[in-house]
Amino acid sequence: MTDEGLTEGLLISPIRNGTVIDHIKGGEGLNVLRILGLTGTCTVSLSVATNVTSRQMGRKDIVKIENRELLKEEVDRIALIAPQSSINIIREFRVFDKKGVDIPNQICGVIRCPNPGCITNTNEPVTSRFTIQQSGLRCHYCDWLITKDIASHII
């Protein structure tokens, strides 16, 4: 059987109120959940679609979070691994607000520096701080540059 002539439909049910994170690079949806602290033990109702066909992106992920609107700090975290994503606020099954994410200039307390000698990885009470650059994330304290696999460094 071919898929010619089939109508496009919803892959996951709509939510009444909450947040839909769309246009996440295919395969990154679970990392988005991780950086939001939404794990298997949370009580929030979640829907995740992975590697959905997208005309714009080829493949994308979608995350739906019922009865929760994201804070700016959470959106900034998402921007680190999904800079092309859009955040849709849903109220009574309708899109109330839709916007893209903005990559912040600096992010604190979100990324763990991979340099074992960095002051943020010692027993000192220092919060990690990274400057976002075109080439990657640069540690404010030791100048270490993270250029790939940013999701694995998220605290």
Curated annotation (Swiss-Prot):
Pfam families: PyrI, PyrI_C. SUPFAM superfamilies: Aspartate carbamoyltransferase, Regulatory-chain, C-terminal domain, Aspartate carbamoyltransferase, Regulatory-chain, N-terminal domain. One of its GO terms (molecular function) is metal ion binding. GO terms for biological process: 'de novo' pyrimidine nucleobase biosynthetic process; pyrimidine nucleotide biosynthetic process. It comes from the Archaea. Belongs to the PyrI family. Involved in allosteric regulation of aspartate carbamoyltransferase. Contains catalytic and regulatory chains. This is Aspartate carbamoyltransferase regulatory chain. It comes from Methanosphaerula palustris (strain ATCC BAA-1556 / DSM 19958 / E1-9c).
